[in-house]
């Protein structure tokens, strides 16, 4: 199994790509970051078995390309001030262009990167798309939920970077939200050591913290409010395969959000899966194998 990394030049920066591949694989998946973390924090995560989720996929016939878009993880350089889903998709399409040819290529987004694989699927860059904890809205939803949009706008300015850390993640998201919803932490015993290992090499890592573009986090509301589209013609998804997953106890992405995503793209060939016994962070929790198996089955079908 080959586990190298490389950079793809894009505008005034370099996109970091970490790949996990195996000889003879004819399928690939390009995995995107979450709100602030590298895709590696989710998929190149070893739950204590000695093998990461990405390595499981590679051993099953699926090469895995985990991409740090500009402003994330180990990427380098300057990002555009207006960091939106089209700019993000342009970066990923550049990575796809430089990849080896495969019989089937899928894209996987998580929560805040929901729109990006869908944009690329509509544009014809991908053969299928996977989104874990889908978070996507239209203009009507944004206008009907002013309190929510104001809360998000208050959480991030329109430019620059915001800083976070493992301590903030534990305090603000895990302890207060995910863990309280399910009653007790479900994370595997190796979680903290694995997360420390995966984040300490970030280009922006400093004193146990890292940064991510603020503008990108707001794309979920600024794009539909200013463009009145999802970033593509929904008709271009006709019959195309999409998998939406959600943790059974995912309080951060309610079931109604998944249902709404299915309604938006009802013309596509959509599959859904609820990951039993997990929260928003299923890949870190004891129920991780069901999540990995579901994604693997979809990518191989």
Regions found by a protein language model. Give the residues of each.
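Short, surface-exposed "cap/lid" segments of acyl-processing enzymes
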Residues: 24-60
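Glycine-rich "HGGG/HGxG" loop immediately N-terminal to the catalytic nucleophile
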Residues: 40, 67-83, 280
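Alpha/beta-hydrolase active-site loop
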Residues: 81-100
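Conserved strand-to-loop "acid loop" that flanks and positions the catalytic carboxylate
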Residues: 243-249
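Catalytic histidine-centered segment of alpha/beta-hydrolase-like enzymes
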Residues: 278-289
